[in-house]
Amino acid sequence: MPKPKDKPFAIPKPMVREAYRRVAANKGAPGVDEVTLGEFEADLENNLYRIWNRMSSGSYFPPPVRAVEIPKPHGGGVRVLGVPTIADRIAQTVVAMYLEPLVEPRFHPDSYGYRPGKAALDAVETCRRRCWKFDWVIDLDVQEFFDTVRWDLVVKVVEAVTDCRWVLLYVKRWLAAPLQHPDGTLQERDRGTPQGSAVSPVLANLFLHYAFDQWMARKFPGCPFERYADDAVVHCKSRRQAEYVRDKIAQRMREVGLRLHPDKTRIVYCCDSSRRGEHEQASFTFLGYAFRPREAVNGRTGEHFTSFLPAISPEALKAASDRLRALRIHRRTDLSLDDLARWLNPIVAGWMNYYGRYYRSEMYPLLRRVSLYLRRWAGKKYRRLRTYKRFKRWWAGLLKREPGLFAHWRWVRAF
C-alpha cells in the first residue's frame, strides 16, 4: 500500500490487510458490483489502499447490499440474505475485528452463535444435558429479528462498549445501506441488519446480550438458557414457572422493539421414563435437532428405557434429502470412482459430523439413499454392472479393497 498521510481516523493498515485475509478465507459470492474475489485480488494493493484511505478519512459510504433468498438452516423456510461487495465485506470486517475483543469478555457463556471457540453443537450438548435436569422448556422464536431490530438500540449497545468515532460512524452507515433486489430495485430500510454482512453477527450478539442474556441472568438466574444468534431455549422447573418466564420474556422483547412469534414460541414438557406427566407439547427443534422422547439402552444393564434426546429433525432431514437429490449423483458419469468420492465425501461427511453426533440411526435412511444413488451411477458408468448380481459382487469387492472410499461407509454399507 502507498505511504499513509494524516487522517481523521487512525485505522491501522495491517488491520485492513488482516480483514482481507479473513474475507478471502471465507470466499463468498460477489455483491452488487459483481466483482469476484479473484477480480478484486487482481489489483489487490490499490483496492486495499482505497478501502483504508476512505475509511480513515471518513469518506467511506457502503454500496447497496445484494438481496438473495436462501433456505433457512436445518430446513426452516427461507430468509433474505444480504451479500455485500468484497470491498464492503473487508470494511465491515475491520469494524468487527475492532469490536470482537471488546465484547467477547462481556458475553454470556451460554451465547454460542458466531463466537470463537463455540459452536452450534456445543449449544445442542448443553441443551441435551439440561433437558435431563429441568422438566420444562420454553422454545423461543424471536419473530424476524434480523429484519426488525431497532437501529437506535443497536447504536446504543455499541456505544456501551466503545466511544470510537469511526466505528460508530460506519455502523450507522451500514445499518442504513439499502437492499438491492434481483430486478435492480432498491429497498430502503428503517430497521434491521441484513444477515450475511460481516458485522451483523457481532452487532446481533451485542444487542441480544443486553436485551436477553444479561436480562435473563439478572431476572431469572435459576432458569438457564442456550442462545445461538436469535434462536434460544430456556429451561424451567415447572409449567407454572415456564408460563411466567415466557410472558416476562415476551414483555422484555416488546420493550426492545421485538416480538416473540405467537405460534412458534412454545412450552414443552421433557417427558421420559421417570417423567410420565402429559402435556400437549413434548418435542421441540433447536439448531436442526429434534428433542423428544426416544428409546434408549442402558450401557451397563442392557435395559431399555425412554429418554429425552436429540436427533436430526425431520426438517433438516428433508433439506439434506433434497440436497442429495439435487446433486444428481447418478448422472456424474464424467467422474471416475475416486473423483466421485472426492466430490461427494465433504458433503456427506458434513451431514454426519453435525447431525450424527446424537442418535445417528435417524440418519441411516439418508445414508442408504447415498448408496442407492451410487448403485445407479455404477450402472450408468459400467454397463456390465447393470444386473443386481454383478453389481453386488462389485460392491462387496470395493468395500473389501477400499473400506474408507466413501464417507458414509463408516456407518452404513448396505443400500
List PLM regions with ranges:
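Non-catalytic terminal/accessory segments
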Residues: M1-F415
